[in-house]
Amino acid sequence: MKILMLCREPRLYSCQRLKQACQDRNIQLDILDPNRMLIKLAVIDAQMQAQLYYQAGEIYDKCRAEPSLLAEYDAVLPRFGVSSTMMGCRVLDYFAAKKVVILNNSTAFRLARDKWSSLQVLAAQHIPIPTSSFAGALFSTAAHISQHRIPLVIKTCSGSQGVGVMLSESKVHSVSLLQTLQQAKVDNLLQDFVVEARGQDIRAFVIGDRVVAAIERNGLENDFRANIHQGGSASVIQLNTAEQQLAVLAAKTIGLDVAGVDLIRSNKGLLVLEVNACPGLDGIEKASKLDIAGLIIDYLLAMKK
């Protein structure tokens, strides 16, 4: 068994844990950066074919190694960040055309990485989300803000680990933030702020048809974001059956095999904040004491059968 992990930062906790899980199962794992790859479409042996090349080293290296044709793989595990989404998904498309097993296909990955598009898909399936809006460049900023109550949440449409998520507590501040984002040509969306859940949310880790673990995350004092990467803390919790079903439904609606589903408790019930295609393992493993990495690899092996 030979697996390819697409990852820019192999030293990260999640990548190292998945690497260890493969080693424990005597699986060969190659960890390669999709940004160092080239996909070639050409007629080879009188037939149109696709080839994938990889080039090690850095752009500034004077004696950089020549690109090499990549070998075949049995399965692909995407773990690339937001900045690598476009190239990473094109590499996933390459392997999909070759019928290689992929954990989280490119269509689902692209959708999950677009916060607004994913919210639209969730809402179309009547999955509860916070009141949200997206406006075109010629729509009045003031009129856009008036669709929400203050304070409100402003999010960039791409971003992870709490980066690009801002809480605005006045109309003046909201206008200033939106004008800045528009000037920088950064797509953004607005959401109602769930006051009653300030600084706290839930991460449900979904693998296949079940929630394998769930944690409650609490943000730092005076920070409404509960992300672990922003300094938040986590404690393991048990979701009831309905809550687990909502998390699994959200992941499946986006099309993901493995997902981190972020939930928030409101006066209207449980809401889905977003669905992550590349959820980190650090917080969930340390809080739950479970071998989530091993469960992911076992699920990938089951997909291969």
Swiss-Prot record:
Give me any GO biological process, just one.
Answer: translation
- State a single Pfam family of this protein: Rimk_N
| Co-factor: note | Binds 2 magnesium or manganese ions per subunit.
Which organism is this entry from?
Haemophilus ducreyi (strain 35000HP / ATCC 700724)
Annotated signal peptide: none
* Ligand binding (Mn(2+) 1): 262, 274
Write out the residues that bind Mn(2+) 2.
Answer: 274, 276
Q: What's the protein called, per UniProt?
A: Probable alpha-L-glutamate ligase
Give the residues annotated as coiled coil: none
**Alphabetical list of PANTHER family matching this protein:** RIBOSOMAL PROTEIN BS6--L-GLUTAMATE LIGASE, RIBOSOMAL PROTEIN S6 MODIFICATION PROTEIN
Going by the entry's taxonomy, the superkingdom of the source organism is recorded as Bacteria
Its Enzyme Commission number?
A: 6.3.2.-
Which parts of the sequence bind Mg(2+) 2? 274, 276
Recorded hits in NCBIfam families, A to Z, give: rimK_fam
Positions contributing to Mg(2+) 1 binding: 262, 274
Q: What class of enzyme is it?
A: ligase
Instruction: Report if keyword Manganese is assigned.
Output: yes
